[in-house]
Amino acid sequence: MSSGLDWMTDLAPVHAIRRKVADRANLPNRMELAGRQAPPAREEQRVNGEDDQARFARVVLPHLADAYALARWLTGDGADAEDVVQDACLRAFRGISGFGEGNARAWVLTIVRHTAYTWLGKNRPATLVVTDDLEAVERAEVARRGTDAEAETPETELIAKADAASLEAAIKKLPPPFRETLVLRDVQGLDYKEIAKVTGVPIGTVMSRLARARQRVMTTIAKEHHDAAG
């Protein structure tokens, strides 16, 4: 029996994105996208001896699966996620010469996140929430919990035990700021500093959003179990 999260291990969309990005950006063919050296470029296109195509293949392509997963969680639809990642890859390609050899995964996911929110703003504005109103509550939550955000909590234990379909449904109900934070941490394994960089908020806000996201997911799953038992 397939689970609700089977799409996370399905690489077909990732391969499709690779092909479409290659076609749209005139990038190397599929063999080159898989890791072979791209053809030599003009000297002015090179950064430290590496042309833009080879740099893109080295920096961006290894993180396409994570990029698609984040876009899929944010948009809630596989085809929409493919469109978002394609656009994000083109943005990344245009800006690849400015990448400073830092955390490539965080850099790519930041672009994907921005692209996803732009797409949502144009296509589903009602799904977006204003995050400014959350800040005061989040600061209070950080003060209450302190800085030990890594510790196991009842929320994380219940989430770990939940079946995949229930978990996906509960995560989809989260407001985007909470959803992306939980996905980046509990699904994709980014640390708090990386999440803060991707989302553009302080680490304390990341901690608060993660705690509140886990609590909401736990509440949703618990209610589902209660309703099923009743």
Roles of regions detected by a PLM:
Residues M1-P62, G121, T127-P177, L190-G200, ...:
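Intrinsic, short, N-terminal disordered tails of RNA polymerase sigma-factor systems
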Residues V59-G78, F93-G95, I171, A222-K223:
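Amphipathic, Lys/Arg- and hydrophobic-enriched alpha-helical face
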Residues T181-R185:
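A short pre-motif secondary-structure segment
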Residues D83-L90, R94, G102-H114:
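Structural recognition of an alpha-helix C-terminal capping motif at a helix-to-coil junction
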Residues Q86, S97, R113, G121, ...:
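Residue-level detection of the helix-turn-helix DNA-binding "recognition helix"
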Residues A67, A71, V108, V112-L120:
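Hydrophobic-face residues of short alpha-helical interaction/recognition segments
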